[in-house]
């Protein structure tokens, strides 16, 4: 008999949004990984299958229990196929362009898929994972840079100290504690009567409403400022965002939501899954404060 686990709050938010917009692909995390020309594709396929078999989170199936609550478990009997293709460069480009498609979170198909492609000039791995089973740490780090490389080189895969399923049970239990109730009361009072800022994005695309990105920021002056004032670069950028938002809203005090990685438990460092948390932020852009003091204030806000 399979054991059902609750969804993390981080997963639940993704689940609800996807149920509201089932045709959206904004929560698809897809990548095209160009492989070295001398790579052995048969060996790469074996390595890929080894990783897939080893990581239960990739086998996650979501279902509704008798009370209509979403629950998850690892369906190790459901095959996650690895596609193998030899095609022209033009065919490969068309294949990649059409690769991303909506997932049915309650359906029969796996929530990830993988394809190895070989053309006359390129070798590549194309893969897509739904955000409900993966985050940036998993998608960009643990899977391609650690597990896949180790498996290809014949090295053992690092074991997961704790699975997301176990952490989800712990999170559900914490919601019943006095500490959780006190934290909920703290945030309710802190943001009571405060309207959260809302920025209009660009025209809707396949990824939803997006904001145009620019590459004008240079890393060197940011690092120099942070070293001089003993602040973290992510907090400097968070403070800059808060200040810009304050100016756009024409309010000294501005509230908005941001994200944190959610892997505060060290036993989750090697764990596959979606741990990114949405957190509320309240910034006071006091014009009398220095930049360094404002960044320090933001750091305290995030603790």
Segment roles from a protein language model:
Residues 4-6, 10, 117-163:
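Active-site-proximal acidic secondary-structure segment that organizes catalysis
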Residues 55, 59, 134-149, 252-259, ...:
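Extended, hydrophobic beta-loop-alpha segments that form or line the acyl/peptidyl-thioester binding
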Residues 3-6, 24-43, 92, 106-127, ...:
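Gly/Ser/Thr-rich phosphate-binding loops and adjoining beta-strand/alpha-helix segments
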Residues 52, 145-153, 242-246, 280:
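Short amphipathic alpha-helical signal-transduction/dimerization elements
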């Amino acid at each position: 008999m399979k054991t059902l686990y609750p969804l993390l709050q981080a997963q639940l938010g993704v689940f609800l949004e996807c149920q509201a917009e089932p045709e959206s692909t904004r929560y698809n995390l897809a990548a095209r990984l160009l492989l070295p020309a001398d790579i052995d594709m048969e060996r790469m396929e074996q390595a890929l299958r080894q990783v897939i078999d080893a990581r239960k989170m990739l086998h996650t199936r979501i279902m509704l229990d008798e009370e209509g609550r979403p629950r998850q478990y690892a369906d190790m009997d459901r095959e996650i196929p690895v596609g193998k293709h030899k095609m022209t460069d033009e065919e490969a480009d068309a294949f990649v362009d059409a690769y991303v498609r909506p997932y049915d979170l309650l359906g029969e198909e796996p929530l990830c898929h993988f394809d190895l492609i070989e053309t006359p000039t390129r070798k590549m791995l194309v893969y897509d994972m739904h955000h409900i089973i993966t985050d940036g740490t998993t998608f960009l780090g643990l899977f391609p840079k650690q597990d896949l490389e180790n498996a290809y080189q014949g090295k053992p895969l690092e074991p997961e100290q704790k699975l997301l399923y176990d952490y989800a049970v712990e999170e559900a239990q914490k919601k019943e504690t006095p500490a959780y109730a006190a934290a909920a009361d703290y945030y309710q009072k802190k943001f009571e009567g405060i309207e959260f800022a809302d920025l209009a994005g660009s025209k809707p695309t396949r990824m939803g409403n997006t904001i145009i990105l620019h590459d004008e920021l240079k890393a060197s002056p940011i690092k120099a400022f942070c070293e001089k004032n003993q602040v973290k670069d992510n907090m400097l950028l968070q403070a800059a965002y808060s200040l810009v938002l304050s100016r756009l809203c024409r309010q000294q005090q501005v509230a908005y939501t941001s994200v944190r990685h959610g892997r505060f438990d060290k036993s989750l460092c090697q764990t596959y899954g979606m741990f990114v948390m949405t957190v509320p932020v309240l910034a006071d852009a006091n014009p009398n404060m220095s930049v360094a003091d404002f960044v320090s204030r933001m750091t305290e806000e995030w603790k």
